[in-house]
């Protein structure tokens, strides 16, 4: 049986090779070998995603590559998720986060990964899915009073709708009761600042650390 370092290295390779079958196999192997799932995700899967992201920024990889890598990571996380849920049930929730892909955008892979990472980190995540109407974010905020409303956009044509979340939360009189987080491929810190969002999530691991800093 491979040791921990070898398993983690294979997990990273599965992402950079866009191999969802290998990612699932490595995740199962890690569980059987007693590798900490969080360590596997952070040092294996997420490290692979960061490498793909860097190549995307350099222009050596393109959006379909990023999506394929994200699909591979999701395949691995799906295998690990039952174990993480078991652990999570034994610990106190760190807070509630409502997350969804913004109205007009049908892409959900990045959002799914962020939701999984937040779940693993100990937050209760209410996933609204993709192509979520602005009013649904606001209604859910009123209903369950989460600590954070998070929206993802993968296209410049849809990220403008993130402004509407800010505006409609204000109109509903609850903007001061909840923090907002924005993320997605075209989203930047400048954009988050411009629309008044509290948190900009650049990557899955970045999101977890920023959310903890904002709430804890």
Curated annotation (Swiss-Prot):
GO terms for cellular component: cytosol. The keyword Metal-binding applies. The keyword Transcription does not apply. GO terms for biological process: homocysteine metabolic process; methanogenesis; tetrahydrofolate metabolic process. GO terms for molecular function: cobalamin binding; cobalt ion binding; methionine synthase activity. PROSITE patterns: B12_BINDING, B12_BINDING_NTER. Residues 1-92 form the B12-binding N-terminal domain. Methylcob(III)alamin binds at residue 107. It holds the Pfam family B12-binding. It comes from the Archaea. Keywords: Cobalt, Metal-binding, Methanogenesis, Repeat. Residues 94-216 form the B12-binding domain. Acts probably as a methyl group carrier between MttB and either MtbA or MtaA. Belongs to the methylamine corrinoid protein family. This is Trimethylamine corrinoid protein 1.
